[in-house]
Design a protein with these regions (language model features):
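Cyclic nucleotide-binding regulatory module and flanking cytosolic helices
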Residues: 1-42, 91-92
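Cyclic nucleotide-binding regulatory domains
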Residues: 19, 44-107
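Residues that recognize and position ribonucleotide moieties
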Residues: 21, 38, 57, 79, ...
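Cyclic-nucleotide recognition modules
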Residues: 27, 79-137, 141
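Amphipathic, well-packed alpha-helical segments that form the structural scaffold of globular domains
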Residues: 32, 36, 137, 141, ...
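Transmembrane helical bundles of ABC transporter permease domains
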Residues: 144-147, 151
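N-terminal positioning helix adjacent to the helix-turn-helix/winged-helix DNA-binding module
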Residues: 151, 155-158, 162, 188
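Phosphate-/nucleic-acid-contacting segments
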Residues: 166-191
């Protein structure tokens, strides 16, 4: 059974997220007041492509693997959502179904805000609209950067950029002096 309360570490991950920490205390309070906690084991399905958008989600612990399935049936990992990151809002805004699958990568804790509560918070806080616009603008900039990289960088350079991103997000010092880092996320080579 899910523990309905975030651990201290999970709460800290949510509160220290770059976007969430920029919100006013009253908006953060209302979001957290409406959120429910769900815990998943490695590989647990969080949301499936084609599902109606019922929840806005934040990763509090572990990671969420966002993927798609190719025509041949192969799972393709698009990204990993790290603790402190919110997602799933696009489908709530446009009313379309989920576009990708989301799975727990390792033991994962998420926060979920029901679609109805999300809309109530939007109605109560005009600041929330502006914050969501900033969040979407940052995502669009990231997407343009990815498209540019795909069209201008060789595979080696794209791989190097991805490794740097993973170290920034999941890096763990592997030597006592911190001179080496390892990625604290179990990945298969093809991912």
């Amino acid at each position: 059974m899910d523990d309905p309360i975030l651990t201290i570490e999970e709460r800290e991950a949510i509160n220290s997220g770059r976007w969430f920490s920029s919100l006013s205390p009253s908006l953060r309070h209302d979001i957290l007041r409406c959120a429910c906690v769900k815990r998943f084991k490695d590989g647990g399905l969080i949301a499936a492509r084609g599902d109606p958008p019922e929840e806005w989600i934040a990763c509090a612990r572990g990671a969420v693997r966002v993927s798609s399935t190719s025509i041949s049936g192969k799972q393709i990992t698009l990204t990993y959502v790290e603790p402190g990151i919110w997602f799933g809002d696009v489908a709530i805004f446009d009313g379309d179904r989920r576009t990708h699958d989301a799975y727990a990568h390792g033991d994962t804790t998420i926060l979920c805000v029901a679609k109805a509560d999300f809309k109530k918070i939007l109605a109560a806080h005009t600041e929330f609209y502006e914050a969501m616009l900033r969040l979407h603008a940052r995502r669009i900039r990231q997407l343009y950067g990815l498209v540019e990289d795909l069209n201008t960088l060789p595979l080696r350079a794209r791989l190097a950029k991805q490794l740097v991103h993973l170290v920034r997000s999941y890096g763990i010092p592997s030597l006592s002096d911190g001179s080496e880092m390892r990625i604290g996320l179990q990945l298969a080579q093809e991912e």
